[in-house]
Amino acid sequence: MWDSSYMQQVSEGLMTGKVPIDQVFGANPLEKLYKRRKPKGTVGLQCSPCLMSKATSTDDIIWDQLIVKRTLADLLIPINRQISDIQSTLSEVTTRVHEIERQLHEITPVLKMGRTLEAISKGMSEMLAKYDHLVISTGRTTAPAAAFDAYLNEHGVPPPQPAIFKDLGVAQQACSKGTMVKNATTDAADKMSKVLELSEETFSKPNLSAKDLALLLFTHLPGNNTPFHILAQVLSKIAYKSGKSGAFLDAFHQILSEGENAQAALTRLSRTFDAFLGVVPPVIRVKNFQTVPRPSQKSLRAVPPNPTIDKGWVCVYSSEQGETRALKI
């Protein structure tokens, strides 16, 4: 029980300063009931080991969770960045695919037109090759022949168009003696003397010279002085000597019409055309191998025991030093 008189005395003593505070608390009758735990030095209030262990384990769990969250955040940041990059890349790829599709739709008619033009070009080249050796007229009664004579009589020289008539005044004038004939007239007469008679055989297979045949083949080949240009010259010469230049040209155009290019056509003919089977390639003498056309130098090989054209050996180069190299396709 509280003692009211004692508490009043204590209050008055504390108010007047007569009673020190330590003395009051030291003489407190409730000291046994209220034991104050004083901290030792600067150490704070201490908890029991059980509470301390619980607090420590809770802090560790919270700290581990915080570390896990930070680790996940660090992992998700680059993943999000990569996903955004992938999305942007996919959008760009989609845009490009749509652009390519649009361009393909625009190119399709151009490709069809290109095939048509290629077919027309092949037909025209074949027609021109035959037209150069075609006799349109064998007499002087046609209107073109009369016009030719009229132009010749008026100007003294043949017209600038090709002279493709056999029996015209220009030929007689070129062959007559005692007359001054200009160079143009002489050239026209020489050309007419080489024109063949019109027949089924000469129309389908004109007897081209080796030079003319090679020039026709060159128009289909890209570049200059390539191994295929040399192959065209060799094949043209062999076909002309065997009398099969017209058949060779027809076979060449036939392969072109099948969709093959000129290089493939020449390679195929060198292996299948009867005039080239088992033929030994010609020998070409050069000062040294540096004088061989540069595009063909990489195709020079050692000469095999029995080279033939149908096995891909075009020609054999022989230098002044006695060395030999074969051109291989």
Swiss-Prot record:
Gene Ontology CC, one term: viral nucleocapsid
Residues in VP35 IID domain copies: 204-329
Keyword match Coiled coil: yes
InterPro entries referenced in this protein's UniProt entry, alphabetically: Filo_VP35 (IPR002953), VP35_IID (IPR031163), VP35_IID_b-sht (IPR043061), VP35_IID_hlx (IPR043060)
Major localization class: virion
Keyword terms: Coiled coil, Host cytoplasm, Transcription, Viral RNA replication, Virion
UniProt keyword DNA-binding, yes or no: no
Coiled-coil ranges per UniProt: 70-120
Protein location: Virion; Host cytoplasm
Summary of the function given for this chain in its UniProt record: Plays an essential role in viral RNA synthesis and also a role in suppressing innate immune signaling.
Complex and partners: Homooligomer. Homomultimerization via the coiled coil domain is a prerequisite for binding to L. Found in a trimeric complex in which VP35 bridges L and the nucleoprotein. Interacts with NP. Disrupts innate immune signaling in infected host cell.
Protein name: Polymerase cofactor VP35
Gene source species: Lake Victoria marburgvirus (strain Musoke-80)
Lineage: Viruses, Riboviria, Orthornavirae, Negarnaviricota, Haploviricotina
Gene it is expressed from: VP35
